[in-house]
Curated annotation (Swiss-Prot):
It comes from the Eukaryota. InterPro entries: Kunitz_BPTI (IPR002223), Kunitz_BPTI_sf (IPR036880), Prtase_inh_Kunz-CS (IPR020901), TFPI/VKTCI-like (IPR050098). GO terms for cellular component: extracellular space. It is found in: Secreted. One of its GO terms (molecular function) is serine-type endopeptidase inhibitor activity. This is Kunitz-type serine protease inhibitor vestiginin-5. Keywords: Disulfide bond, Protease inhibitor, Secreted, Serine protease inhibitor, Signal. Residues 1-24 form the signal peptide. It comes from Demansia vestigiata.
């Protein structure tokens, strides 16, 4: 196989690994925590994993001292917690 073909294969495998959902057995335990607004008074949109709905949902984050089930983007939440 040519080096171009190997690079293409490597790229496709990397893409597949990034898009493959996290299985529930591999999901970090913090994904089960409820959304935590934190102790600050800001109004920042963040995302958390909701285990009963098996998906990521938005919530208002205060800006500091929240639990780890808190993501800046929907994509980051899905990549980390969604099955």
């Amino acid at each position: 196989m040519s080096s171009g073909g190997l690079l293409l294969l490597l790229g496709l495998l990397t893409l597949w690994a990034e898009l493959t959902p996290v299985s529930s057995k591999d999901r970090p335990e913090f994904c089960e925590l409820p959304p935590d607004r934190g102790t600050c008074m800001g109004f920042l949109q963040a995302f958390y994993y909701n285990p009963s709905q098996k998906g990521c949902l938005p919530f208002m984050f205060g800006g500091c001292k929240a639990n780890p089930n808190n993501f800046k983007t929907l994509e980051e939440c899905k990549r980390t917690c969604a099955a």
